[in-house]
Structures are given as structure tokens and as C-alpha cells.
From Swiss-Prot:
It comes from the Eukaryota. It is an enzyme of class 1 (oxidoreductase). It comes from Penicillium fellutanum. The lineage of its organism: Eukaryota, Fungi, Dikarya, Ascomycota, Pezizomycotina. One of its GO terms (molecular function) is oxidoreductase activity. Its EC number is 1.-.-.-. This is NmrA-like family domain-containing oxidoreductase phqG.
Length: 338
């Protein structure tokens, strides 16, 4: 009898939105070919315990500690890496950056003998605008990607995420767009989605971290060499702002409409980084033809194929989530205050 040896896939950032989605998807493989290991700074956290309850192994390590990280990666066949570029600890000019953290994690994976790496990267807005605009969270990840490409892994696959549907659970994001989809107009009861012109054809790529990102990464790990050095776009749906509002009505029955703001500057500053970066993104999109992925045109074909592969491996049917389906589920969660 042949005993199948499980492939150890270690997830750095495994208690975050991206990492936990990847861990859950891999653990759902019908043949259980993956042993999922999650690196966390706090194994006693509720999020760590939740992912462990599904069958993941927890390992405590600090991303900046080469020894701890090398031990955490020991025996790993594959690694998924996502760092939190919004972490305030990585924002000080006097301290380490998200680039420093990403490089440290990649160096540890290489030292541990990891073969296959999937890295959650970012588009270079600086390159796309010929140096006119810099968004640190994207730029540092882009440069970590370039570093990882040169490290000589058996396969290295950068993945670019579309805008997250789950941002509609984040109050500062919702506030920037007139309260959509949760805050109705007091006079009419309808919800209004207000944004500046997106640019290009007006259709923006979005991804559900919860529903699709993990499956897309799962699909890569099913055939990693096929995606070596391939920039994978993680997109659930490419859709106009008008149709986002229409999808909400179709999902909930609540009247919603889209209202285009005159300019990117119509998004008023309020002292938060979220609001400032949102303004910048809409300036960029308008001036770069609506290209969310910066120098790369949007292409959903790879995401569709990877999702299909993952679902087949899990004995599930279906495909990438639509905003209509996502809003239907999100409204229930919102009403339950989850």
C-alpha cells in the first residue's frame, strides 16, 4: 500500500483575512493532500484558535527573527506570504518597513529549503504614473516581489489582489462613498454609492477575500510550476459602479443607486490615511485608464481557471462570487452585527 505524504504548506499571516482564506481552502481539499501550518505571533488569539480548530498546525514566530522563521518553515513544500502593509509598526521612517519584513520572510523560506512560494504582492503605481504618485503599501510589496523573483525558488508566484469586497465592512471605506451600502438617505430610504469617475471603461476589479482568494491560491499550489514567475490577478468580478449599486438592490430589495462625483477631489480629506489614499487611487485610476493592476490590463481568465481547479479538488460546484451573491450574505452578517 502506498502511503501519501502530505505537502506541508506554511502560511505567513495565516490569522489575517488573506492567510486564513488560504488556510481554509487548502484544508478543504477532499484528498487532504496538504498539511497546513500557520505562523502567528500569538497562538492563543481567537483567530489562531479558530484556524487551528479546522486542522491547521500553529507555530509561533516573529517575521523579523531569521532563526525562528527558518524553524517555522522547516519541512515546508510551499509557502503563502502576506504581510500587513497597514501595520503602524512598519510606517515609521526610523524603524523597519514592510519591505524589510517581506525580505526577511522570503530569506527565511529560502534558507529552510522551501520549493514553492506564493507572495501577495502589489502593483507599482510609481511605475504606472512615471514617478508621479507613490502609494507605500503597494510599492513596498512590488519591490519585495522583485526580490523574491530572483531568489531561485522552484516556483515563485506573485499574486495581485483586486479591491476587496470586504472593504464594505470597514467604516472609513463606507464613509468615503456616502455610507453605501449600509447608511440610507434619511429623506428617501435609498442607499447611494458615490464615487468619482473610475476611468477607462468604468469597470473595476473586485475580489472576495473570504470566498475566492484562498481558492485562487489553492489552485496555484495544485500546479505551482505552471505559474512560476506568472503574475496572477485575483479577481472575483469586474463591474461598473452603477452595477455594484444595482447588485445591492437585487440582493437585498433595498433601493440603491449610483451617483458619480465631479472629481477625485470631491472625496474630502478627514485626516485619515484611508481617505487620503482613496482620493489618490481615484486620481490614479482616472489618469491611467482604469487600470487597477497598474501596468497590467485586467484579465480574469486565470482566476476563473484556478477557482475551478480548487473547487474540483474540494468536490464543490460553482465559481467566483458575484457582488449580488456577496451582498446577500453580507447583509445577513451586518444585520447580525458580525
Amino acid at each position: 500500500m502506498t502511503i501519501q505524504v502530505k505537502r506541508v504548506v506554511t502560511v505567513f499571516g495565516g490569522t489575517g483575512n488573506q492567510g486564513s482564506s488560504v488556510a481554509r481552502s487548502l484544508l478543504a481539499h477532499k484528498a487532504k493532500i496538504f498539511h497546513v501550518r500557520v505562523i502567528t505571533r500569538d497562538p492563543q488569539s481567537d483567530k489562531a484558535k479558530a484556524i487551528a480548530s479546522l486542522g491547521a498546525e500553529l507555530v509561533q514566530a516573529d517575521g523579523f527573527n531569521l532563526g525562528e522563521m527558518t524553524n517555522a518553515f522547516a519541512g515546508s513544500w510551499g509557502v503563502f506570504i502576506n504581510t500587513n502593509s497597514d501595520d503602524e509598526a512598519l510606517k515609521s521612517l526610523d524603524g523597519p518597513s514592510d519591505y524589510d519584513l517581506g525580505v526577511s520572510v522570503i530569506d527565511s523560506a529560502k534558507k529552510a529549503g522551501v520549493q514553492h512560494v506564493v507572495y501577495s504582492s502589489g502593483p507599482s503605481i510609481t511605475n504606472a504614473t512615471k514617478g508621479r504618485m507613490h502609494l507605500e503599501g503597494f510599492e513596498t510589496k512590488y519591490h519585495v516581489e522583485q526580490y523574491g523573483r530572483r531568489k531561485g525558488f522552484t516556483s515563485f508566484t506573485p499574486i495581485l489582489c483586486a479591491s476587496f469586497m470586504e472593504c464594505f465592512f470597514y467604516d472609513p471605506f463606507v464613509d468615503a462613498f456616502g455610507g453605501f451600502p449600509w447608511i440610507p438617505e434619511p429623506e428617501t430610504g435609498e442607499v447611494v454609492f458615490r464615487t468619482p469617475d473610475y476611468g477607462g471603461k468604468g469597470d473595476m476589479p473586485w475580489v472576495s477575500c473570504e470566498e475566492d482568494l484562498g481558492d485562487i491560491v489553492h489552485g496555484i499550489f495544485l500546479n505551482p510550476c505552471k505559474y512560476d514567475q506568472v503574475l496572477v490577478q485575483a479577481t472575483s468580478q469586474q463591474i461598473t459602479m452603477f452595477d455594484v449599486a444595482a447588485s445591492y438592490t437585487q440582493a437585498t430589495g433595498i433601493p440603491a443607486r449610483y451617483e458619480e462625483l465631479p472629481s477625485w477631489s470631491s472625496i474630502k480629506l478627514n485626516g485619515t490615511r484611508c481617505r487620503a489614499e482613496t482620493r489618490q487611487m481615484f486620481w490614479y485610476m482616472k489618469h491611467c485608464g482604469g487600470r487597477w493592476f497598474a501596468e497590467h490590463e485586467s484579465d480574469m481568465s486565470t482566476a476563473v481557471a484556478l477557482k475551478e481547479s480548487a473547487m474540483l479538488s474540494q468536490d464543490r460546484v460553482g465559481g467566483l462570487v458575484t457582488f449580488q451573491a456577496w451582498f446577500k450574505k453580507a447583509k445577513v452578517l451586518k444585520d447580525q452585527n458580525v
